[in-house]
């Protein structure tokens, strides 16, 4: 761009009043500079807009995935807590019945019933 301006000013200074060939060259150079800037700005704006649209769609998908994941994690936590409550209740029942043997404690923790239960 700097070279274009230098050439243009040099040719413009060399041109005579009668013919003025420098004006045509300068107009040509300035038109090219304007076109390059115009195209570059438009392409850049289109890229920014398309990137923003893509990011918005991507974030919506991520948000849905995150909400779904959160729900699944919440259900796992509820099931885990319910399972812990069942294990604690079984331990309590085993202790209440007069001291649990090794076999009964194991069955209370794992939920597997042994022989004779």
From Swiss-Prot:
Ranges for region Disordered: 96-117
Note: Completely overlaps YIL100C-A.
Protein name: Putative uncharacterized protein YIL100W
Lineage start: Eukaryota, Fungi, Dikarya, Ascomycota, Saccharomycotina
